[in-house]
Amino acid sequence: MADQSNNMIIEEVNKGLNPGTIVLLVVATLLILFFVGNYALYMYAQKTLPPRKKKPVSKKKLKREKLKQGVSAPGE
């Protein structure tokens, strides 16, 4: 008799999914969808958007770089 009552309790606990498991599955699914969506958007943007233009380098920076290399800047 004691064995049957213990088995019934265990079976009742195992019926259905644990609420914690459901929450974990939902959160994991949302995270995976988020990352897959981000990756898809990134790949789409790489194909369709034109490449970014580089910022123009200031004359002051050019002068400094040339002085570092040992080449005299023009106009000096």
Curated annotation (Swiss-Prot):
One of its GO terms (cellular component) is nucleus. Residues 52-76 are annotated as: Disordered. Keywords: DNA-binding, Nucleus, Repressor, Transcription, Transcription regulation. The keyword Repressor applies. The keyword Repressor applies. Residues 52-66 have a biased composition (Basic residues). Its main location: nucleus. GO terms for molecular function: DNA binding. It is found in: Nucleus. It comes from the Eukaryota. A motif (Nuclear localization signal) lies at residues 50-55. Signal peptide: none annotated. GO terms for biological process: regulation of DNA-templated transcription. Transmembrane segments: none annotated. PANTHER family: DNA-BINDING PROTEIN S1FA1-RELATED, DNA-BINDING PROTEIN S1FA2. Belongs to the S1FA transcription factor family. DNA-binding protein that specifically recognizes a negative element (S1F) within the RPS1 promoter. This is DNA-binding protein S1FA1. The gene is S1FA1.
